[in-house]
Every structure is written in structure tokens, then in C-alpha cells.
Amino acid sequence: MPEGPRKLLDASALLAYLQRELGFEAVREALREGAAISAVNLAEVAGKLKARGKDPERIVRRLLAMGLEVLPFTLEEALEAGALDPLTRPLGLSLGDRACLAAGRVRGLAVLTADRTWAGVYLGVPVEVI
């Protein structure tokens, strides 16, 4: 695997991969090449898995063994996410969405998402809708 992640996964992208939904192949390829997820977005994934009766800890351990990197949510990213609020509020993007976009901007990583709302959105970070 290359040094450091090459793509940043939004919660929706990782969930699409885990559930073999539309676009999961793009996430599988990103995982092979080196992918990361913000701890904020991983919390979203864990919550959804738990709500569906799955064992988030077991699933996350498996993803980590595959090379998924979990990135801490930094002060710089928190401030960036706050700055994105007025720009993304009209689009209905959540705090988790802004956290992902902020992490991508700060770390210089393209973001993969399954959220079609992000199509055509450019806030200083490349977004790939799977």
C-alpha cells in the first residue's frame, strides 16, 4: 500500500461498500490503493451499523486490517468545517458532511461519497460521487 491515504471516504461511501450498494466497487478500489476516513464519519458508520443490528467493532477491525486509516478530527478541520457551514447549509449537508469536506481540504485528499447531493459541489476539494 502507498504511503498515506490517497482518498478520503465519506460515511455514505463506506456504508455503500459494506452493503454492496451502487458504487461499492469504487470504494473497494480506493481501499486497495489507500483510503482513510475521519473519526467523525466513522462514528456515523458505527451508529448506522449498530442500528441495523451489526457489530461495528468487528467490522471496523476488519476494515483496519484491510488498511483503512482512521484520521483524527483536528482543530484546523473543526474550524474549516465551521467555515463551510454557511456555504453548505443551503444544500442540506450535515455536520458529518462538512467534517469530511474539511478533512479533505486540510489534508489535500479527494473525497468519495455516495451522497448525490454533493454532485457539482466544489468547495476546494475534489468530490467523486460513486
Please place each PLM-identified region on the residue numbering.
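Short, well-structured N-terminal submotif of metal-dependent ribonuclease cores
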Residues: 1-37, 49-61
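Acidic, PIN/NYN-like endoribonuclease modules and their adjacent C-terminal/linker elements
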Residues: 1-6, 101, 105-130
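Histidine- and aromatic-rich ligand-binding microenvironments
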Residues: 9-10, 37-39, 93-95, 111, ...
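Alpha-helix capping/helix-boundary segments
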Residues: 13-14, 41, 77, 99-100, ...
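A general structural signal for well-ordered alpha-helical segments in protein cores
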Residues: 24, 42, 56, 78-81
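Anion (oxyanion) recognition and catalysis
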Residues: 31, 64, 105
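Active-site neighborhoods of divalent-metal-dependent phosphate/nucleic-acid chemistry enzymes
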Residues: 69-112
